[in-house]
Amino acid sequence: MGPSSAFLGVLFLSGTLGLTTSPARGRLRCYTCSFAKPCDPVPRECREDEVCGVSVGTSGRTLVRWPFSRWLLSFLPMAAAATSAFLFCPTEQKEEEVIERKGCLPRAQCPLLGHATYWSRSYSLRHQCCEQDLCNAAASQPPPNLPLMTLLPLAAMIGWGVHDFL
């Protein structure tokens, strides 16, 4: 067995194992769409240092509402309502809006948090990255509803007869 046979054997073995002799790998193709709804994704080729990603942005806004404020305004004179409003504790209600965009992201940006402004509103971004062709097709799932997640185990415990032990 000569040197040329050994070289051909190594070349065949590296091809079988999926190793390539050229440094150029194919670039990823990712779906791309902006924050606008509905998202109609369009495939696009990324740059060498980019991966596919889904960026999910949340905008938390706190609204302060005074309990019984409508009742006070309708039944009491305006002056009395204005002076009595401080007697009631305000309630806070979080109103969160979620936006999403897909596209190519620099690999180094994946673990980092980001910020974006969309329609004059500020959003905190989290990135979910993947490294296969068109792997960012699926929509991200919204966070679970906290009251629902609390009630479901309680209902299951009652249904299974655990209420006897409580």
UniProtKB/Swiss-Prot annotation:
For the keyword Transit peptide, the answer is no
What InterPro entries would the database entry show? Activin_recp (IPR000472), Ly6g6e (IPR039700), Snake_toxin-like_sf (IPR045860)
Example GO biological process? acetylcholine receptor signaling pathway
Q: How is it modified after translation?
A: O-glycosylated. Contains sialic acid residues.
- Main location class: other
A GO molecular function for this record? acetylcholine receptor activator activity
The cysteines joined by S-S bonds are 30-52, 33-39, 110-129, 130-135
Cellular localisation: Cell surface; Cell membrane; Cell projection
Q: Which residues form the UPAR/Ly6 domain?
A: 28-151
Q: What does this protein do?
A: Believed to act as a modulator of nicotinic acetylcholine receptors (nAChRs) activity. In vitro potentiates alpha-3:beta-4-containing nAChRs maximum response by increasing peak current and slowing down receptor desensitization; the activity is dependent on its cell surface localization.
PANTHER family named in the record: LYMPHOCYTE ANTIGEN 6 FAMILY MEMBER G6E
Q: What is this protein called?
A: Lymphocyte antigen 6G6e
Species whose genome carries this gene: Mus musculus
The encoding gene: Ly6g6e
